[in-house]
Design a protein with these regions (language model features):
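Membrane-interface segments of envelope glycosyltransferases acting on lipid-linked substrates or membrane lipids
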Residues: 1-356
Length: 356
């Protein structure tokens, strides 16, 4: 498991349930990034050999679950879902399984996967309605057992910060337009298209801030160099607190091409009041409505992306209107407390269903 919105949600959700008085344990692979980050969130951690689908991992997880006597096991990826599904069948009084699915990559329809989703798992939670509909339509899941619970954002962490102050905090210049992205550096997040769009943006001296790290970093750095943009692109790396980076931006861009639920970073930007440019990948349209809460462009289209960025940089009133509408839309629907309330209900429904 790497590090991105999925892992941040896992730890934030765990911390939230701990604060509400629940007993929570994170099971993770030794040496994994999420295991390293868990203490910073105050989340109890048990490391197990569960990085691969192997009998040793099943046995270790079964022993841990037997000792802990949990009510619910919430899995988040293919590997942990398979290991947990087998492990609980080794227990006399097993916990129920709830699977959270974070991406819109198609789920296979082979017999094993059908068993995992339809029989072994009590409930499935998705991070966007588009993902829920996909599982019902393409995989035949019972609609009553699948629900969309997008990631919740702590609004207090994204209170408006004066732009000049934010730029001083993160070391960005005060006198140039700055476009930014917060995302793990994966190919489908669209970083390359955003870099290419910078060569087409007509607003003078526009800079790009790339916040995040990941497998595409070296590739992107070479591409930035090849495009002659080294002086105009800032690679900020992974940042625990992205609020000042968002506060420093004139425009937030997330040009994803695939796989998205409701992206956590796009929600953060909207809570922070930053005008947004994005695409209609995955469940993004659930919060990004073109001309209402964001500007939405076709995926993999640097020219369209550049045009939208120029439009927001030139028309600050438009940016203010979109940002205000976006914040008004997401605040009552995508807050942290809302997510925790809905996940609590999902877990309780799973437990009740298992008793029938």
């Amino acid at each position: 498991m790497g590090w991105g919105g999925q892992e941040i949600r896992i730890l934030t959700e765990a911390r939230g349930f701990l604060d509400r008085g629940h007993r929570v344990v994170l099971y993770a692979t030794p040496g994994s990034r999420i295991a390293a980050e868990a203490p910073g969130y105050g989340v109890p951690l048990v490391t197990l050999p569960i990085g691969r689908k192997r009998p040793a991992g099943v046995a270790a997880l079964a022993r841990a679950l037997k000792a802990a006597r949990h009510d619910v096991v919430n899995t988040h990826s293919s590997t942990d879902s398979w290991l947990a599904a087998v492990a609980v069948r080794m227990l006399r009084d097993p916990p129920v399984l709830v699977r959270t699915r974070h991406v819109s990559v198609p789920v296979p329809n082979d017999p094993g996967t059908r068993w995992l989703y339809r029989k072994a798992t009590a409930r499935v939670v998705t991070t966007g309605e588009a993902l829920r509909l996909q599982l019902v339509r393409d995989n035949g899941l019972d609609p009553a057992r699948v629900e969309s619970i997008p990631t919740g954002i702590d609004a207090s962490a994204y209170a408006a910060l004066p732009q000049d102050e934010a730029r001083r905090l993160v070391g960005l210049p005060l006198d140039v337009p700055i476009v930014g992205i917060v995302a793990t550096l994966r190919s489908w997040k669209g970083h390359r298209h955003l870099v290419d769009s910078l060569t087409k943006v007509s607003t003078p001296h526009t800079m790009l801030a790339i916040v995040g790290d990941g497998p595409q970093r070296e590739v992107l750095e070479r591409h930035v160099d090849a495009q002659g943009l080294v002086g105009r692109v800032r690679f900020a790396g992974q940042q625990r607190d992205v609020a000042p980076w968002l506060g420093a931006l004139d425009v937030f861009a997330l040009p994803s091409t695939a796989n998205e639920g409701v992206p956590q970073a796009l929600l953060q930007a909207m809570f922070a009041g930053v005008p947004c440019v994005t695409t209609a990948a995955g469940a993004i349209p659930e919060i990004a409505r073109d001309g209402e809460t964001a500007l939405v462009v076709p995926p993999a289209d640097p020219a369209a992306l550049a045009s939208a960025i120029d439009r927001l940089l030139a028309d600050r009133a438009l940016g203010t209107r979109l940002a205000s509408a976006a914040r008004a839309y997401v605040t009552p629907r995508f807050g942290l407390a809302t997510m925790l309330d809905r996940m609590d209900k999902a877990f309780r429904r799973a437990i009740e269903d298992a008793k029938r």
